[in-house]
Swiss-Prot record:
It comes from Oryza sativa subsp. indica (Rice). PANTHER family: SPX DOMAIN-CONTAINING PROTEIN 2, SPX DOMAIN-CONTAINING PROTEIN 3. Residues 1-166 form the SPX domain. This is SPX domain-containing protein 1. The SPX domain is sufficient for inhibition of PHR2 binding to DNA. Keywords: Nucleus. Involved in plant adaptation to phosphate (Pi) starvation. Inhibits PHR2 DNA-binding activity via a Pi-dependent protein interaction. Suppresses the regulation on expression of PT2 by PHR2 and accumulation of shoot Pi. Optimizes growth under phosphate-limited conditions through a negative feedback loop of the PSI (phosphate starvation-induced) signaling pathway. Regulates the expression of SPX2, SPX3 and SPX5. May be an important link between signal transduction pathways related to phosphate starvation and cold stress. GO terms for biological process: cellular response to cold; cellular response to phosphate starvation; negative regulation of unidimensional cell growth; positive regulation of cellular response to phosphate starvation; regulation of leaf development. Residues 197-227 are annotated as: Disordered. The lineage of its organism: Eukaryota, Viridiplantae, Streptophyta, Embryophyta, Tracheophyta.
Length: 295
């Protein structure tokens, strides 16, 4: 599958409301088609060589650009600004949400409120999933930049991909250390709320099955420490949108990183965490059925 179609598919499978925040790959390809091929001729190459001798390769590339190429690069820079603004905004939002969830966990534990603990840990799982989606956002956009710049270099004869990607590696949207830290803190909260001796309940017989995505026919749930709730026969079972999106995102990340066996300067780094799509599904299945019901 071509990257443009793959990107569209991934957006639909993860968080379609982020659609306009992703790389405008189709628009960049349209701009690229406006650029004449062939590398610009001997005169252009000579001009580039003269400027490179005085001011460096980046300045030389800019000086030798046609108006169409300059328009392409302006759009590319605007895309970087878009990624960074959205990514930083989400990180700031996640810092606040993480603190709020930590406070809610502490309050619920202090009151020994089983229902509130169930609600908050469901929200933590959703929150964890959304942060994984943001990591997927970073990886997809990076991959798209690498691919469109490869097309640009091939069409123009320029060699801007490597210096541009080196610049990208320093951008906020690609710097996911803080996001990774938030994800690990989120997992630590879940570890506190999901003790190892608690049996996950994801179906009526009480056996957790991470591969079973069918709707429970007669849902019931046991609460933490032996508390019970009434039968939930009238409540329609719904999987969380973030659970679905997160599993799709993790599969996408795995595919992106395994797309080529050759490691190069443009390869994505390995995932910092060790979550797989199956492990994320299992994490979801640890939440009692009532917390997967429609809100």
């Amino acid at each position: 599958m071509k990257f443009g179609k793959s990107l569209s598919s991934q957006i639909v499978e993860t968080l379609p409301e982020w659609r306009d925040k992703f790389l405008s790959y189709k628009d960049l390809k349209k701009r690229l088609k406006l650029i004449g091929g062939g590398g610009g001729g001997e005169e252009r190459q000579a001009k580039r060589a003269r400027v490179a001798a005085d001011g460096g390769e980046e300045e030389a590339a800019a000086a030798a650009m046609t108006p169409e190429e300059a328009g392409f690069m302006r759009l590319l820079e605007a895309e970087l600004d878009k990624f960074n603004s959205f990514f930083v905004e989400k990180e700031e939002e996640y810092i606040i949400r993480q603190k709020e969830l930590q406070d809610r966990v502490a309050r619920a534990a202090g009151r020994e409120s089983k229902e509130e603990l169930m609600r908050v840990r469901k929200e933590i799982v959703d929150f964890h999933g959304e942060m994984v989606l943001l990591e997927n956002y970073s990886a997809l956009n990076y991959t798209g930049l690498v691919k469109i710049l490869k097309k640009y270099d091939k069409r123009t004869g320029a060699l801007i991909r490597l210096p541009f990607i080196q610049k990208v590696l320093q951008q906020p949207f690609f710097t996911t250390d803080l996001l990774y830290k938030l994800v690990k803190q989120c997992e630590a909260m879940l570890d506190q709320l999901l003790p190892s001796n608690e049996l996950p309940v994801s179906s009526e017989d009480g056996r957790g099955d991470s591969t079973n995505e069918d709707k429970p026919s007669n849902p019931s749930s046991s609460l933490v420490n032996g508390g019970t709730i009434p039968e939930l026969d009238e409540i329609e079972y719904m999987e969380s949108m973030y659970m679905k999106g997160t599993v799709a995102a993790l599969r996408s990340l795995k595919e992106i990183r395994s797309g080529s066996s050759t490691v190069s300067a443009f390869s994505l780094p390995p995932l910092q965490g060790d979550s797989s799509p199956e492990e994320q599904q299992e994490l979801w299945n640890k939440i009692p059925v009532i917390e997967q019901a429609a809100k």
